[in-house]
Regions:
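Short, charged, intrinsically disordered terminal tails
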Residues: 2-7, 93-97
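Compact, glycine-rich, soluble single-domain proteins
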Residues: 15-65, 73
Length: 97
Protein backbone atom coordinates (compact mmCIF):
# COMPACT_ATOMS: atom_id res chain seq x y z
CA UNK A 1 0.00 0.00 0.00
CA UNK A 2 1.34 3.42 -0.97
CA UNK A 3 0.59 6.71 0.65
CA UNK A 4 1.40 10.30 -0.29
CA UNK A 5 2.88 12.52 2.38
CA UNK A 6 2.37 16.29 2.69
CA UNK A 7 5.84 16.78 1.15
CA UNK A 8 4.69 14.89 -1.94
CA UNK A 9 6.65 11.75 -1.12
CA UNK A 10 5.19 8.39 -1.99
CA UNK A 11 5.78 5.97 0.88
CA UNK A 12 5.40 2.22 1.08
CA UNK A 13 6.23 -0.30 3.80
CA UNK A 14 8.04 -3.34 2.43
CA UNK A 15 8.77 -6.60 4.22
CA UNK A 16 12.17 -8.20 3.69
CA UNK A 17 11.49 -11.79 2.64
CA UNK A 18 14.81 -13.03 1.29
CA UNK A 19 16.83 -15.26 3.60
CA UNK A 20 19.92 -13.03 3.84
CA UNK A 21 18.06 -9.75 4.26
CA UNK A 22 19.36 -6.45 2.92
CA UNK A 23 22.97 -7.64 2.50
CA UNK A 24 25.61 -6.29 0.08
CA UNK A 25 24.31 -7.87 -3.14
CA UNK A 26 20.68 -7.05 -2.36
CA UNK A 27 21.64 -3.48 -1.43
CA UNK A 28 23.57 -3.12 -4.70
CA UNK A 29 20.52 -4.27 -6.70
CA UNK A 30 18.34 -1.82 -4.76
CA UNK A 31 20.71 1.08 -5.54
CA UNK A 32 21.03 0.11 -9.21
CA UNK A 33 17.26 0.14 -9.53
CA UNK A 34 16.92 3.51 -7.77
CA UNK A 35 19.47 5.01 -10.17
CA UNK A 36 17.27 4.11 -13.17
CA UNK A 37 14.56 6.55 -12.06
CA UNK A 38 14.30 10.31 -11.73
CA UNK A 39 13.48 10.02 -8.03
CA UNK A 40 15.09 10.55 -4.65
CA UNK A 41 14.61 7.59 -2.33
CA UNK A 42 14.93 7.31 1.45
CA UNK A 43 14.77 4.01 3.32
CA UNK A 44 14.01 3.80 7.04
CA UNK A 45 13.97 1.05 9.62
CA UNK A 46 13.04 1.92 13.19
CA UNK A 47 14.80 5.23 13.90
CA UNK A 48 17.54 4.78 11.28
CA UNK A 49 17.41 5.93 7.68
CA UNK A 50 19.59 5.85 4.59
CA UNK A 51 19.55 7.20 1.08
CA UNK A 52 18.32 4.73 -1.49
CA UNK A 53 21.48 5.43 -3.47
CA UNK A 54 23.87 4.26 -0.72
CA UNK A 55 24.81 0.58 -0.58
CA UNK A 56 26.62 1.03 2.73
CA UNK A 57 23.78 3.07 4.20
CA UNK A 58 21.25 0.38 3.28
CA UNK A 59 23.43 -2.34 4.80
CA UNK A 60 23.75 -0.32 8.02
CA UNK A 61 19.97 -0.57 8.47
CA UNK A 62 20.55 -4.25 9.35
CA UNK A 63 17.24 -5.26 7.80
CA UNK A 64 17.11 -9.04 8.12
CA UNK A 65 14.45 -11.45 6.98
CA UNK A 66 11.05 -10.64 8.42
CA UNK A 67 11.78 -6.98 9.14
CA UNK A 68 9.93 -4.13 7.50
CA UNK A 69 11.47 -1.10 5.86
CA UNK A 70 9.73 2.14 4.96
CA UNK A 71 10.64 3.38 1.51
CA UNK A 72 9.81 6.96 0.47
CA UNK A 73 10.39 8.52 -2.93
CA UNK A 74 10.00 12.00 -4.37
CA UNK A 75 10.44 13.23 -7.91
CA UNK A 76 8.82 12.85 -11.32
CA UNK A 77 9.21 9.05 -11.35
CA UNK A 78 8.61 8.40 -7.64
CA UNK A 79 5.60 6.11 -8.15
CA UNK A 80 7.32 4.01 -10.82
CA UNK A 81 10.43 3.75 -8.64
CA UNK A 82 8.45 2.64 -5.57
CA UNK A 83 6.57 0.05 -7.64
CA UNK A 84 9.83 -1.33 -9.08
CA UNK A 85 11.49 -1.45 -5.65
CA UNK A 86 8.47 -3.21 -4.17
CA UNK A 87 8.69 -5.85 -6.91
CA UNK A 88 12.43 -6.25 -6.26
CA UNK A 89 12.01 -6.65 -2.49
CA UNK A 90 8.97 -8.95 -2.69
CA UNK A 91 10.78 -10.96 -5.38
CA UNK A 92 13.61 -11.67 -2.92
CA UNK A 93 16.03 -9.50 -4.92
CA UNK A 94 16.08 -12.23 -7.57
CA UNK A 95 17.93 -14.59 -5.24
CA UNK A 96 17.50 -18.34 -5.47
CA UNK A 97 16.98 -19.87 -2.04
Amino acid sequence: MSASNPDGAITRIMKIVNEKGLHARASAKFVQLVEKYDATVKVSRNDDSAGGDSIMGLMMLAAGIGTSITVSATGPEAKQCIDALDALVSGKFGEEE
